[in-house]
């Protein structure tokens, strides 16, 4: 299989993001341990939707189209929305000290988890990616346990975190470059 390696994204990154460029090239130049190419690009697409950076999302989307079906793209969107909801609730619940409130049921609809057009493992991988962004310990642990029970390796789970970390850094670099400001010029003490 010919890997493009998100080259259009790498080309947009500034020189001070060389580590990020190198990591993107390495992550998307070959199949990562425990993840199919489709899953790698699905994770990247879910991350792109979550990060909401149009430049990055367009770069990811252009290459993801080669590896994904429309159902995969929809699953990535579902993952962002559902995980945003559940992570917010579980972060709230874990921060509450009142035991009566903690004991109340969430009663949140989660129909995306039962959608037959979405492969359960892929959807869980996408949800894990978003849980990592949202720093929801409860959701992250829940998705990891579910993925392990489905036969996903710990190396694959670690690779999800690697993809998410690198794409968040890429977004930061792109946003710095889009800030309208004058270049930083150091001046001597006598200026």
Could you tell me what each predicted segment is?
Residues 1-39, 45-118, 148-149, 156, ...:
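Acidic, glycine/proline-rich low-complexity segments that act as flexible tails and inter-domain linkers
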Residues 43-59, 126-142:
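Short, thiol/selenol-centered motifs that function as redox-active sites or metal-ligating centers
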Residues 123:
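Basic- and aromatic-enriched surface patches that contact anionic nucleotides/nucleic acids
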Residues 137-158:
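Short conserved catalytic/interaction loops centered on acidic-Pro-aromatic/His motifs
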Residues 161-162:
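Interfacial loop-to-transmembrane junctions
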């Amino acid at each position: 299989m010919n890997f493009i390696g998100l080259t259009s994204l790498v080309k947009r990154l500034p020189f001070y993001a060389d580590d990020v460029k190198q990591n993107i090239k390495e992550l998307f130049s070959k199949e990562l341990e425990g993840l199919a190419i489709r899953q790698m690009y699905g994770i990247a697409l879910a991350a792109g939707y979550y990060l909401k950076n149009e430049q990055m999302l367009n770069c990811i989307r252009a290459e993801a189209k080669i590896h994904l079906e429309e159902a995969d793209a929809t699953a990535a969107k579902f993952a962002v929305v559902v995980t945003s909801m559940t992570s917010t609730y579980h972060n709230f619940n874990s921060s509450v000290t009142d035991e009566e409130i903690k004991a109340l049921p969430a009663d949140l609809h989660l129909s995306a988890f039962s959608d037959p057009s979405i492969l359960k493992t892929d959807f869980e991988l996408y949800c894990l990616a978003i849980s990592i962004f949202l720093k929801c310990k409860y959701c992250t642990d829940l998705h990891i346990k579910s993925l392990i029970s489905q036969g996903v390796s710990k190396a694959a789970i670690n690779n999800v975190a690697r993809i998410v970390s690198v794409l968040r850094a890429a977004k930061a670099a792109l946003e710095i470059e889009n800030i309208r400001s004058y270049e930083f010029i150091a001046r001597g003490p006598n200026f």
